[in-house]
Amino acid sequence: MYFIYFEVWRFFSGEGYFNMASITFEGVKKSYDGKNFVVHDFNLQIQDREFVVFVGPSGCGKSTTLRMIAGLEDISEGKLYIGDRLVNNVLPKDRDIAMVFQNYALYPHMSVRKNMAFGLKLRKVPKNIIDKKISEAAKILDIEQYLDRKPKDLSGGQRQRVALGRAMVRDASVFLLDEPLSNLDAKLRNHMRSEITRLHDVLGTTFVYVTHDQTEAMTMGDRIVVMKDGYIQQVDAPQDLYDKPNSLFVAGFIGSPQMNFLDAILLKEGECFSLKIGDMLIPISRGKVDGSDLESYVNKTVIVGIRPEDIHNEDVFIKVSPESAFDADIDLIELMGSEMYLHFEFQGHRVVARVSSRVTTRKGDRVKLSIDMHKAHIFDKETEIAICH
C-alpha cells in the first residue's frame, strides 16, 4: 500500500494532475421522443472527490444518467454542472471526464501501451509526457509486465485494469464507470471491487459508478443513489440506506437475502400499539412509536418488513422476547458456511431467516424462532412509503 501511495504522489507531481470537481443535476430529464421520459426530474449534488454509486434494476435510467454526465446523451430538460461549469452543450471531449465501460472498449490490434496512449496522442500530448504517464499508471495498477501485449492475451481482470489505466492517464476531474465488472466472474469481481475502491482512495478524484448489483453499491460507495423507472428513490450512505429505507422498493432491493414483508393490522389498546400478523399479536416498542405517524394507521393494514438476520434461533433471545416467538417448519435450508438461510411459511407468508450454522437444523425440523421487533420496519400498504423503522 505504501508503494501505491508513493507512486500516486509521483503521478500527481508530474505533468498535470487531477482537477477536482463536483457534479450538480438541477431538474434534469431525458426523453428520446419528446413525450415519454426515461429520466424524471433528477436533482442531485455529488461532492468533489466523492464516490457515488447509481444502482437499480435494468431500465431504471442509471446508465442513461451516467451518459448524460459524459455528454454521450443530450439533456432534454434541466441543467447539469461539472464544478461551476454548465455543460449541457459542452462536447464530451471538453468535459474533462474519463469513462470506463462494461466491455473495456480496447482496440484489439493495439498493445496495452498504445491503447493507453491513444487518447493522449489525439490531444497531441508530447511523447515524453505520454510515456511517463503510462509508466506511472501501469505501476499503480500493476500492469507493467503487460504493456507490450495485445488485449487478447490478457485475462478479464487485466483488461479491466488497462481500461482503468487508460482513464487515469487522461488526468480527468471525473471518473465515470458503467458496470465495469459485469463481465467478470464472481471471484474476480470481488477482487476488482477492492481495487477500484483503493484506486479512488489514492487518486482522490470524483467517481460515479453504475451497477445493478447491490453488493457492489453497498461495499464501494460513499453514497448510493437508488433508482427505479427513471426516478431517484433514495440517496444515502450505505448503512443508512440499509437501516432506514424510505420505501418498500428500497427495502426489498437493498440486502441479500431480501427483507421479508408481512401484511399486518395495526392495533392500539390504551397507549400500546401492536401488530396482528395472522393469529399472532406482537407488541411494538414505545421507541418505535415516538416521532412516527402510526396513530393514523390504527385498524388499518400495513406492511411489516423484517430482515432475515433479525429472526433469531438463540434460546437467550427467545426468552427475552417470548411475545414474538413462534414455531416454524423448515422446508428449505441454504448452508452458507458460517451461517445458513432457513426457509419456511409464517402466517401465510414465505419467510427467510439468516442464522448461525453452529445450531444443527435440518430440512423438515420444527424450530423455535423469534422476531426482533426493535428492528422491524413498517410501511404504508397503499403508498409503500416507510412509516417507521
Model segments located where?
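Conserved ABC transporter NBD signature motif
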Residues: G78-L86
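Glycine/charge-rich catalytic "coupling/switch" loops of P-loop NTPases
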Residues: C272-D331, R350, T360-H389
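Conserved coupling/switch loops of ABC nucleotide-binding domains, chiefly the family-specific signature
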Residues: S76-K79, I129, D229, A376
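The feature captures the beta-strand-to-loop junction immediately N-terminal to the Walker
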Residues: V55-P57
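Helix-to-loop junction immediately C-terminal to a conserved catalytic motif
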Residues: A70
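Pre-Walker A (P-loop) beta-loop-beta motif of ABC nucleotide-binding domains
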Residues: F42-V53
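ABC ATPase nucleotide-binding domains
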Residues: P92-F249, F253
